[in-house]
Amino acid sequence: FFFQAEDGIRDVAVTGVQTCALPIYAHAAAVPLTGLTAWQALFEHAQLQPGQRVLIQSGAGGVGSFAIQLAKARGLHVISTASAGNLDLLRELGADQVIDYNAVQFEKEVSGVDAVIDGMAGEVRERSWKTLQPGGLLIALTGAPPTDAMAAERGYRQTTMLVHPDRAQLTEIAALIDAGKVRPILEAVIPLAETARAHRLSEGGHARGKIVLQVV
């Protein structure tokens, strides 16, 4: 994965142990950013352990779909939200409880979770606080970050994360892909010349998995 490289190209040779089972380049391109974001939220910031409970908002998205699979691979109890048309995908990815956020108020269905992975912000974040157990952690992936004071007023903790490159974590994710426990979900592979269409699709907020731009 050329996660830290930019503005350069060269020939390289890799051994079999440096590769993973993703024969389609678009699938490989979908792994580093979303995979590391999900991994670092779950295991670096929240430090979740087997048996703990996590609420993953927007589980059908790029980060959410990775987070569900990584959490289940670690033995977590996963609750996730999505629109009705994506609930089957969440179940397929391993979520223990799925919630249609358009049909019910998720905060009335969920309580006592150890962490919330929130990629939606706004009023969804405000409602997400109510699902945490005392001292639970809300991890904000987007939007205006909550403050420690806001969290303390509610009896919880919060953090805002910015993903960083990590070769060891990518190696662990690759091993899970090889083992068939994790797979990237793609909404679309779009030619670079149609970047504007890709942006419109992304900004619509209903992409199922990752949108990948194809350079050649």
PLM regions and their residue ranges:
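Terminal helix/beta-alpha structural elements that buttress the NAD(P)+-binding lobe
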Residues: 18-216
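Single conserved hydrophobic/aromatic residue that forms the stacking wall/gate
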Residues: 1-20
